Amino acid sequence: MARGPKKHLKRVAAPKHWMLDKLTGVFAPRPSTGPHKLRECLPLIVFLRNRLKYALTGDEVKKICMQRFIKIDGKVRVDVTYPAGFMDVISIEKTGEHFRLVYDTKGRFAVHRITVEEAKYKLCKVRKITVGVKGIPHLVTHDARTIRYPDPVIKVNDTVQIDLGTGKIINFIKFDTGNLCMVIGGANLGRVGVITNRERHPGSFDVVHVKDANGNSFATRISNIFVIGNGNKPWISLPRGKGIRLTVAEERDKRLATKQSSG
């Protein structure tokens, strides 16, 4: 039996949303252990080389990182396989660019540029609330942050807004019907809509019904829901398409319309 950590990842076994081609190599970068799961993260090397095209090879990415140019959530990261994940803010000071990792409606991480103001905070979903040693209350977020002494009104599934400079909670959104949310797992990954209803199933998974801006309704498990705004107003800027998934026919019509208007 193999002992110790796994250090390799075959290219065909890598997550589909990294969009690596099969034939350019045998292996893929295996993400380091970190705040996001292997299948739900995007290693820094894939973001810099395959998405932004700032490097051609892994060696070049290493040289960029080792010069301490790349910050994730306000902290310098030199590990090329660091697992960046949903809602992380990637800053490149040399170019003055800031990106937030959010899903597009195809379930992939979009290269979504944000302003300097927006890069100062991130949203985190509350996964768990516990009482620690000496009765100190803690909350644990989706990106493995532990925050002590949170506001007692904050409960599991709520979303907290965190200042990346201090790591403190500056605001929060309750998980409630009528609030805007993004789906972060399952078949509806990347869709954005308003929570219309929550079905409680004790002993099983609670189901949440969501309605998007086009009026289409869908349902998913509560664990896949990430609240991103109070009422209809999102607290973060959304990528192109605003989280509205089009059917194949709608996509075709939209493509033809843009073709005719440009032609």
Curated annotation (Swiss-Prot):
<dbReference type="Pfam" id="PF08071">
    <property type="entry name" value="RS4NT"/>
</dbReference>
<dbReference type="InterPro" id="IPR002942">
    <property type="entry name" value="S4_RNA-bd"/>
</dbReference>
<dbReference type="InterPro" id="IPR014722">
    <property type="entry name" value="Rib_uL2_dom2"/>
</dbReference>
<keyword id="KW-0694">RNA-binding</keyword>
<feature type="domain" description="S4 RNA-binding">
    <location>
        <begin position="42"/>
        <end position="104"/>
    </location>
</feature>
<comment type="similarity">
    <text>Belongs to the eukaryotic ribosomal protein eS4 family.</text>
</comment>
<dbReference type="InterPro" id="IPR013843">
    <property type="entry name" value="Ribosomal_eS4_N"/>
</dbReference>
<dbReference type="InterPro" id="IPR000876">
    <property type="entry name" value="Ribosomal_eS4"/>
</dbReference>
<protein>
    <recommendedName>
        <fullName>Small ribosomal subunit protein eS4</fullName>
    </recommendedName>
</protein>
<dbReference type="GO" id="GO:0003723">
    <property type="term" value="F:RNA binding"/>
</dbReference>
<dbReference type="InterPro" id="IPR005824">
    <property type="entry name" value="KOW"/>
</dbReference>
<dbReference type="Pfam" id="PF00900">
    <property type="entry name" value="Ribosomal_S4e"/>
</dbReference>
<keyword id="KW-0687">Ribonucleoprotein</keyword>
<dbReference type="InterPro" id="IPR013845">
    <property type="entry name" value="Ribosomal_eS4_central_region"/>
</dbReference>
<dbReference type="InterPro" id="IPR018199">
    <property type="entry name" value="Ribosomal_eS4_N_CS"/>
</dbReference>
<keyword id="KW-0699">rRNA-binding</keyword>
<dbReference type="InterPro" id="IPR032277">
    <property type="entry name" value="Ribosomal_eS4_C"/>
</dbReference>
<keyword id="KW-0689">Ribosomal protein</keyword>
<dbReference type="InterPro" id="IPR036986">
    <property type="entry name" value="S4_RNA-bd_sf"/>
</dbReference>
<dbReference type="InterPro" id="IPR038237">
    <property type="entry name" value="Ribosomal_eS4_central_sf"/>
</dbReference>
<dbReference type="Pfam" id="PF00467">
    <property type="entry name" value="KOW"/>
</dbReference>
<dbReference type="Pfam" id="PF16121">
    <property type="entry name" value="40S_S4_C"/>
</dbReference>
<dbReference type="GO" id="GO:0019843">
    <property type="term" value="F:rRNA binding"/>
</dbReference>
<dbReference type="GO" id="GO:0022627">
    <property type="term" value="C:cytosolic small ribosomal subunit"/>
</dbReference>
<dbReference type="GO" id="GO:0006412">
    <property type="term" value="P:translation"/>
</dbReference>
<dbReference type="InterPro" id="IPR041982">
    <property type="entry name" value="Ribosomal_eS4_KOW"/>
</dbReference>
<dbReference type="GO" id="GO:0003735">
    <property type="term" value="F:structural constituent of ribosome"/>
</dbReference>
